[in-house]
Amino acid sequence: MKRSNVKELRKLAARIRLETLKVIHSRGFGHVGGSMDLADLMAVLYGEVMHFDPKNPRDPDRDWLVLSKGHAGPAAYATFGLMGFYPMEDAYTLNQPHTRFPSHTDRKLTPGVDLTTGSLGQGASTAAGAALGNRIDGRRNRVFCVIGDGEADEGQVWEAFHFAYAHKLDNLIYFIDNNGYQLDGRTADILDHGDIAKKAAGFGLYTQEIDGHDVQAIYDAIENACAKKGVPSCIVLDTIKGKGATFAEPKREHSSQPGEETWQEAISAAQQALAALD
């Protein structure tokens, strides 16, 4: 990937972080931690990798994103707004009456959302089903699925990996957001997965582990995965929960409800981070 593209993707990630904060701020509270740490991945997917048409979100030949950790919806809403699926301001109605932007993603409400998620683990399975269905239909598109490391407590995730391997779904790439924390604390203290990359590889998936905030590394890992034939892939993203949110990153918070002054400080810091990339 060209150096100029890397710079633009870093800017896009910074914009996604800023807009994610604004989206959640519109409600006053929400899932900041697990949304902010996905900005770099979302920037690479929608800024460089995926085939999609904002004017035709149901294009049958589009690439799919299944945000299995559906509570990170604000990161998706920010990305879709920046990509032109709808005016960005529309997403500033997060979780409010009659909104199209619930806290967890819903394909019937929000343009750009491919599958409804939120019940942890289920997105891993539905992504595998979508990948198999697309292959049966003769389509050459890909399905990308994002799973949280805390979500991987669910046995359904590993059953989905087994299914994907058994059906040789090489049009399916899983990402594990390995930020080390979940709702109730450190993942290692609640249900220790050990070496989660090694575990995914043990289910037969072509597995890579990378810095989840390095856009070049993310792009290269996706390129490697796309080149693999006959097996599904898993990319473990080592991330920092709450990355870029001044009040959430130090505490690795899952959900946050700061005061207005704290919100404004965080938004200002995100604006400065974006400006520094110009």
Task: Annotate each predicted stretch with a short phrase.
Residues 63-65, 141-145, 172, 231-239:
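Generic beta-sheet signal
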Residues 28-36:
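Structural motif
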Residues 13-29, 177-179:
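N-terminal capping segment at the start of a domain
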Residues 20-23, 35-166:
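Cofactor-binding active-site loop characterized by glycine-rich and histidine/acidic residues
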Residues 215-278:
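Glycine/aspartate-rich loop-and-adjacent alpha/beta segment that forms the canonical ThDP
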Residues 1-16:
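N-terminal hydrophobic or amphipathic helices/low-complexity stretches enriched
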Residues 112, 116-227:
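Thiamine diphosphate
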Residues 31, 71, 103-105, 122, ...:
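Histidine-centered active-site/metal-ligand motif
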